[in-house]
């Protein structure tokens, strides 16, 4: 593997000194970029794009050609794991992801098998190794998965949900069934992420998109417990260096202390969290990633610049901050505004790393 030329993202996650605050964007390879739309059209549909290693590599690299980003993230989808478990993933126009065979009964859960990441998910591993090779050591590659709870919400509900009625009914009326599902998913995600590291991922991120829908105690029981299980089983060294792990629960600002106890290296913050407060609470244990409201990218470049200034000042001096949005970039954002955001982070952050 090529020697890593820019490792400030990995260094910041481990709270080692950096020259400027590293920056990348969730969904940086996505629909706001015209070149992404062209490649997706070439692929035919979203999952065909994910399953084609060369095209997945191409869209992963597209934002790096435009912007001075400090990391690349694998182009894939969190629902690849349940799809590999045989649920029949498809995308309904205007509806988002759906499953032909939801796992909403104990019987269905019992029948689920944990997929072999090198077999059923071999197309993801091929994409990881292709991207790592084509990056040529420019920046590190982030691998990722959804959290067990978040994957389970889609599997039990049969797709996206606003109320989470079916899975919450299972959580409170049939908790043993849900725990069986979450346990299988924790095993599947651990294998999946370790396979990504074996194929070239240099950092890992677990996206708990729907953990914030849970009550205080239910979050620990149904989400955090299974992320803890994954963290305990992850490969944390490869290529002679540490493989940092970031946990991100959207709406998880209440639980930062508990998340930091898992042994992860960093926590992702959404935009509802004050980063100065987060650093006071958990900055002695973990690095922090975030946390500009993605909608701020609709503002003028001058206003974006000011928002970046405020967030950097909120975190303050020293390493341990990876700048990002508080969630994925919106599809209608002007790519020039994303560029202004990235430039502002590098320009304004040097003073905090003297």
Curated annotation (Swiss-Prot):
Gene3D superfamilies: 3.20.20.210. Pathway: Porphyrin-containing compound metabolism; protoporphyrin-IX biosynthesis; coproporphyrinogen-III from 5-aminolevulinate: step 4/4. The record marks 77 as: Transition state stabilizer. It is found in: Cytoplasm. Keywords: Cytoplasm, Decarboxylase, Lyase, Porphyrin biosynthesis. It holds the Pfam family URO-D. Coiled coil: none annotated. Its EC number is 4.1.1.37. This is Uroporphyrinogen decarboxylase. It comes from Shewanella loihica (strain ATCC BAA-1088 / PV-4). The lineage of its organism: Bacteria, Pseudomonadati, Pseudomonadota, Gammaproteobacteria, Alteromonadales. The gene is hemE.
